[in-house]
Amino acid sequence: MTDTEKSFDPDRFPPVLEALKQALASIEEIHQRSLAIEKMVLDPGPMINNYYPIDVTYKGIIADKNNTPSAFILCANPMGKTLVRDNVEKAQAVKALLHSSHNQVIDLPFLNGDVNGVSWAIYDLNFPLTRNRWVWQLQKRLLIPVVGQWLTDVVAQTRKTIPDKAHPMAIFSPLESICCENEFPREMIKGAENAMKHLASGAWIPCTSLAHNDLWRGNIMLPSTARIFTRQFRVIDWAGADLYGIPFFDLFKFLQSFTVPRGYGKKMIQNHCDILGCRSMDATGYLLTALGVLGQNLNQFPHHAYVKLAKELYALSLTY
């Protein structure tokens, strides 16, 4: 695939933005919330390798008439028209899957639709976690237990045993792809080989569970009504979620991003193992399977970034 085929020309977006502003100006809820649509600016974020990938979305904060930030807008690009709609539909499916006590961390848009075939959505405003390293130490100390418990409960609510007939595609194939990756260390490949042996012998009976698949610090937010030091949180960006995903990938991404202390991390891993009915060594098999699935479905994710992530998460798993 050439850069032209996998990139998006930002010059194609201004007509979409103008059409979007016109469409929103006629919506009653926009007026009820006093949102200054005419002033909103949408940004695709930084370029990646000097181009915008075709899965880029435009984002912006919408202020009210008093210039107070009041809402968040997400809009697809003309080459990936359904990106935002797909994100919303996946979040709806996830919210419907979880118990009401656990699905409140998922915010759905209060408005969404299409303009010129390009999907968009507007959400109540949430706030990112702090970038101040001193504040972050206290913030994460409050959040690690509640996010960790939420993760454990989600696995408990959505756990399903994978039928034997599904093992070749669901487990063996991803693990074999790990073994075929030349840039992975021998120890990592050996881990995948051992996982396949445990599966073949029946010592490991794998399960699926809901997987967000990108559960890092940037996708955990604070609701606008919460204070900076809070145990309330929201999880955003469900586009890559899988209702029947591979356990442990979310957990290790979370442990990495939040630099969770070893003792607490070991407890969280054991909680997952207890729910899934597996041994602690099988956590590595789950992680490598999830990494294999990711490697088979990179889409716009650069291969070098995948290799780096996989090595880091595998190395992290050995420390627990």
PLM ranges: what are they?
Residues G117-L129:
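Conserved short submotifs of the Hanks-type protein kinase catalytic core
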Residues A93-S101, N126-P168, A192-A203, A211:
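Conserved kinase catalytic-core helix
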Residues A226-I275:
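Active-site Asp-x-Gly
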Residues S209, D214, N219, D237:
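Conserved catalytic-loop position in the HRD/HxD motif
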Residues L74-N116, V135-V154, F249:
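A conserved alpha-helical element in kinase catalytic cores
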Residues A23-D43, T161-H212, P223-T230:
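An alpha-helical support segment within catalytic cores of ATP-dependent transferases
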Residues M1-M47:
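Juxta-kinase regulatory segment immediately upstream of eukaryotic protein kinase catalytic domains
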Residues K266-K267, Q296-Y320:
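ATP/Mg2+ or Mg2+-diphosphate-binding catalytic cores
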